[in-house]
Amino acid sequence: MSTSYYPHPIIAREGWPFIAGAFVVALVVQFFAGWVWALPLWLVALLVLQFFRDPPRVIPTLAGAVLAPADGRIVAVDKVQDPYLSREALKISVFMNVFNVHSNRSPVDGEIRDQWYFPGSFLNASLPKASLENERNALWIRTKEGRDVTCVQIAGLIAKRIVCHVHPGEHLARGQRFGFIRFGSRVDVYLPPGMKVNVGIGDKVQATQTVLAEFR
């Protein structure tokens, strides 16, 4: 699996400025005011550090597997109209709270055929209307078998910064890190109809390690 976008995957690079800032503030307060005043700031710094953790994951070898693009909880498994490719599709949505790992990983092997970015609102990402009203970044990925998958990063109530490191024409491997959403969010995956679905509403999933569905 390529790690070219994340040279240090244990701590996501998107968090380095926040982590550095939190620790510098804690150090300065400790130097000038002592441990008592600095302790709450050290706790905040540790929380920021854990938020941006980005541990490596084991990639399943199951042929035809569609992997979870993020850690979190399943909030939707619906037959819908894919708004990006104008087709009937199965939508599986993963909601990330502030305690989940927020690195986003490719659900399938394939070439990025197109990409769309939409500014929008910052509604609670667990709400259904967040899929079409919130700020979002969508990737159209086509597998070597010609199957189309749409993976959509969606900003949430707290998350207001979507990061995507890939572009049309590039190839993604299953489980490859391609982006990050800071401070809570959601990822929607639109799949062709007729998939074997392996998850249900309320299930907790782990990015890359959980198989959301399988191509038949």
Curated annotation (Swiss-Prot):
Catalyzes the formation of phosphatidylethanolamine (PtdEtn) from phosphatidylserine (PtdSer). Heterodimer of a large membrane-associated beta subunit and a small pyruvoyl-containing alpha subunit. It is found in: Cell membrane. The active site is at S185 (schiff-base intermediate with substrate). Its EC number is 4.1.1.65. It is an enzyme of class 4 (lyase). This is Phosphatidylserine decarboxylase proenzyme. The record marks G184, S185 as: Cleavage (non-hydrolytic). The gene is psd. Is synthesized initially as an inactive proenzyme. Formation of the active enzyme involves a self-maturation process in which the active site pyruvoyl group is generated from an internal serine residue via an autocatalytic post-translational modification. Two non-identical subunits are generated from the proenzyme in this reaction, and the pyruvate is formed at the N-terminus of the alpha chain, which is derived from the carboxyl end of the proenzyme. Pfam families: PS_Dcarbxylase. The modification Pyruvic acid (Ser) is found at S185. InterPro entries: PS_Dcarbxylase, PSD-A. Belongs to the phosphatidylserine decarboxylase family. PSD-A subfamily. It comes from the Bacteria. It is a peripheral membrane protein. Pathway: Phospholipid metabolism; phosphatidylethanolamine biosynthesis; phosphatidylethanolamine from CDP-diacylglycerol: step 2/2. Its cofactor is pyruvate. Binds 1 pyruvoyl group covalently per subunit. It comes from Nitrosomonas eutropha (strain DSM 101675 / C91 / Nm57).
